């Protein structure tokens, strides 16, 4: 491996956790994307990431309430909390926000944990495409 095999710069972007903990809203996320597009994109900043707990309607800090009621679809997949991300209503997910960020020439991402949410296990939901 030689020195030219490495990225010249680290990935550059903004994630909601650093400013809002788990409580970011759609409005705040878009405002930060606007700022980044106007002031930072020219310097290589490109990632806008909605961090953890976007699926938790009562998230209001960096504290994680034990056994909070998470927003999930019928298969136990996490979906955005509509009270915090109104454009996600009617099963639209993050599409509108992702389109908004992409139109600014930036890349959108979400934080997601691996595995099946405890709430889905407790509810014994069926995994899509299986009989389990």
Sequence positions of predicted segments:
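Mature N-terminal, pre-catalytic/accessory segment of carbohydrate-active enzymes
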Residues: 1-25
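Active-site beta-loop-alpha junctions of metal-dependent nucleic acid enzymes
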Residues: 28
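Aromatic-lined carbohydrate-binding/catalytic grooves of carbohydrate-active enzymes
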Residues: 32, 36-132
